Amino acid sequence: MEQADTIIQIPHFYGSLKGMQDKFDKYARQDAFTGATREEWEAWKETSRETLKDLLGWKYMESCDLDPRVEEVVELENGIRREKVIIQVEPEVYMPMYILIPPKQDEGKQKCFLALPGHQGAGKFSVAGRDDIPAVKRMIEFYHYDYGMQLAKRGYVAICPDCRGFGERRDEALQKGTDEKSFLTSTCFHLAHMAEPLGETVAGMCTWDASRLIDYVYERGEWDTDDLGVVGFSGGGMQTLWVSALDDRVKKCIISGYLYGYRDALLLLNGNCSCNYVPHLWEHFDMGDIASLIAPRPLAVQSCRDDHLNGPRG
């Protein structure tokens, strides 16, 4: 790095990380499960879910009519139908999505997955396989981001939403940009600044919206809710973790690139996206505690040795 001649070089810094690590070690995970029986675990599960909902800011979330609207229907090659649907997740708060519906193989209801998006993929556009958009095509090739389309090709209905701050749900800071970066990225940072002083969180809003999406699946009534799955990569994995932990209507889930320990992945790596951070969460639980609320439902986790977001211990 080129040395500037307008500053002085600091030989030693007095940062806060060591003190924060010590506080984490002293105060973290006070509500971890300490029982020994299934009955104790079931009681802990219910109490923990209520604690998590409070931490996420769900007491401020408002339910409403879903008011679903089909805005577009496109017939794709290989027989897949792509619907663009918008639902209302809170009063005057809307979630657009693509629904990929493959041809039916039999008379029974089709199996269904929520395919939740992560960062750098323009929300639903990558997950639903919009490779006709050059920037999205590059993200699909780099991250294998089109898992919604891949599910549809395997016979599953894939519901691919824009979570808050992504795609068509970007907030004002990135709405006017016509550049590729604005299109692909999200406004999680801006959402966090709006939400947290009100007692809400980005993770809480995204989890609420995913649960409302399940409401829509049930209300629509066309697909098999007895085997409802959720899958997500990176930030989509975060959403998958939370909604699966809090909503028993999720029957199976796949988390890719998001199951860490908070000390390594979000305290040491403290430059991660604002959507990861929930005030007071670390006092109560680590991420594994949240994941344990999914049991006994099936959970598959993909985690890679070279994923730098795992933290220094890999």
What kind of region is each of these model predictions?
Residues M1-R81, V89, Y94:
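N-terminal targeting or regulatory segments adjacent to alpha/beta-hydrolase or S9 domains
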Residues V74-P134:
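Glycine-rich active-site/cofactor-binding loop and its immediate structural neighborhood
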Residues G108-K109, L114-W208, Y218-E219, D264-L268:
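Cap/lid segment of the alpha/beta-hydrolase catalytic domain
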Residues L114, D227-G229, K252:
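Residue in the alpha/beta-hydrolase core beta-strand immediately N-terminal to the catalytic nucleophile
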Residues F189-E200, T207, R212-L213, V250-S292, ...:
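Mobile cap/lid helix-loop segments that gate and shape the active-site cleft of serine hydrolases
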Residues V202, S234-G237:
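Active-site loop->helix "elbow" adjoining a glycine-rich segment at hydrolase catalytic centers
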Residues E222-S234:
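Alpha/beta-hydrolase fold nucleophile elbow
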Residues G237-D248:
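Short glycine-enriched nucleophile-adjacent loop
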